[in-house]
Amino acid sequence: MTEMLKGIAASDGVAVAKAYLLVQPDLSFETVTVEDTSAEEARLDAALAASQDELSVIREKAVESLGEEAAAVFDAHLMVLADPEMTGQIKETIRAKQVNAEAALTEVTDMFIAIFEGMEDNPYMQERAADIRDVTKRVLANLLGKKLPNPATINEESIVVAHDLTPSDTAQLNKKYVKAFVTNIGGRTSHSAIMARTLEIAAVLGTNNITELVKDGDILAVSGITGEVVINPTEEQIAEFKAAGEAYAKQKAEWALLKDAQTVTADGKHFELAANIGTPKDVEGVNDNGAEAVGLYRTEFLYMDSQDFPTEDDQYEAYKAVLEGMNGKPVVVRTMDIGGDKELPYFDLPKEMNPFLGYRALRISISETGNQMFRTQLRALLRASVHGKLRIMFPMVALLTEFRTAKGILEEEKAKLVAEGVAVADDIEVGIMIEIPAAAMLADQFAKEVDFFSIGTNDLIQYTMAADRMNEQVSYLYQPYNPSILRLINNVIKAAHAEGKWAGMCGEMAGDQTAVPLLVGMGLDEFSMSATSVLRTRSLMKKLDTAKMEEYANRALTECSTMEEVLELSKEYVNVD
């Protein structure tokens, strides 16, 4: 029987293939009284070690297929496994209650999950609850001798169907065989959606009940462009979906022809299309997709991939590799953004109720605790500056005094290197990320002292709307097109231009095809996105008329009071298919 569902279009693409139902094993168990608690602790240690080995392998595969940024979610999982407080409590429960490891594990992790989930105003802690739940499932499976589903074993063209896909599930998808996936829950900003876009696999999320309607082997037709899913489609529907897939493939082939083209609008105005990276390995993808710059190099992955603080020489080699790999094209390097959801096992940070609003990023760098680490990074960057066109960017800046302090440290290290006879480029631009509303509101003052702005919309939207984009209960508040967000962005761009400076954007919004026309109208100079979005965005920009987009942006800023009104207005101005 044919049935149609509508979900959230999370990753572009069209596919028709057999359904592969990702079924979770039965992890139920009985609580058993044990006499030999030492043996039970040994069982727990073995399960923890096996889980750690599995996650390490999955992380390595994720780095290869998805890049360092997407793979970083597994660092949080590995940290849960290594958390001495939690593992210590599990062992204490085994000894005190003389119960089997399964019962102790579940009792302790359920307690942690309940505590973290109870912090409803703290999205960071709620994300930790999700990490603990995912890791607990893996450890429990190892204790019970059960195998978790392994999507890596799929060896024929399939569409994966699941209630939800964990990051470890998504990281194991082989896009040679997995043509799409569909889930009951999730949205465009979930980890699985972001990974799907990186892998270029079609995805439709949030269908509510796809797992109740589909059996293994059913034929599915999926459009990650429209969000439509058809179960056991008719021959006519299959033909329609295949035609849509061919049209999309043809469109992608046309985009590929733009690799070496200039990014200019229909009326000849140039905009810079850049790409975001996490490691030197990512530069190949930047060049393959015709990006004109690296608009965001997230250097924290250098720290997260090390067992200790990376040395000045190690960092120098990494920065040099990126600058040389870009062959003179600009590279914006963000200084370390540690803290929040990025912890280092070798760097003790204080436990905080809300780390996203606490001691992180530049706040650590300019503090006494992080000062030497910051100076080491700046020296490495300054030494590497002679190998390309370096731009340095400070993250999480709220106050002008923070920028002045950071720039002062940079100047001190530059003077030391010059005194040592080390060559340093004399044309390094220094800017800040605009991700805190306070900085966006005071952009006119910052613009007098910085060389550029890069707007980090992911955090700017969260902080402005007071809504975690990963929290489904408040995800409706994560509104890139809300007029309040658009006005903040416009304020930053205009402030930069008033001082003869440039403004870029490195959040997801920069590559959002709905947002690009608005941002062109506002005069954003540089758009930095995932490398796989560059060619598509270049194609879109070639069809836009700047004057028309300026009129559209002006009306959106002055006439609209809701996101829905902005999106409705876009229909009058944007028709580039």
Swiss-Prot record:
Record keywords, A-Z: Cytoplasm, Kinase, Magnesium, Metal-binding, Phosphotransferase system, Sugar transport, Transferase, Transport
Sites where the protein binds phosphoenolpyruvate: 298, 334, 458-459, 469
Top-rank taxon, per record: Bacteria
Principal location listed in the UniProt entry: cytoplasm
Gene Ontology molecular-function annotations: kinase activity; metal ion binding; phosphoenolpyruvate-protein phosphotransferase activity
GO biological process, one term: phosphoenolpyruvate-dependent sugar phosphotransferase system
Membrane-crossing residue ranges in chain numbering: none
SUPFAM superfamilies in alphabetical order: Enzyme I of the PEP:sugar phosphotransferase system HPr-binding (sub)domain, Phosphoenolpyruvate/pyruvate domain, Phosphohistidine domain
Any one GO CC term of the record: cytoplasm
Cofactors that this protein relies on: Mg(2+)
Catalytic residues in the record: 191 (tele-phosphohistidine intermediate), 506 (proton donor)
Cell location: Cytoplasm
Record EC number: 2.7.3.9
Family: Belongs to the PEP-utilizing enzyme family.
Any further remark recorded for this protein: The reaction takes place in three steps, mediated by a phosphocarrier histidine residue located on the surface of the central domain. The two first partial reactions are catalyzed at an active site located on the N-terminal domain, and the third partial reaction is catalyzed at an active site located on the C-terminal domain. For catalytic turnover, the central domain swivels from the concave surface of the N-terminal domain to that of the C-terminal domain.
UniProt xrefs under PANTHER family: PHOSPHOENOLPYRUVATE-PROTEIN PHOSPHOTRANSFERASE
Biological role stated in the UniProt entry: General (non sugar-specific) component of the phosphoenolpyruvate-dependent sugar phosphotransferase system (sugar PTS). This major carbohydrate active-transport system catalyzes the phosphorylation of incoming sugar substrates concomitantly with their translocation across the cell membrane. Enzyme I transfers the phosphoryl group from phosphoenolpyruvate (PEP) to the phosphoryl carrier protein (HPr).
Domains (record comment): The N-terminal domain contains the HPr binding site, the central domain the pyrophosphate/phosphate carrier histidine, and the C-terminal domain the pyruvate binding site.
Self-association state and partner proteins as the record states: Homodimer.
Protein name, UniProt field: Phosphoenolpyruvate-protein phosphotransferase
Gene: ptsI
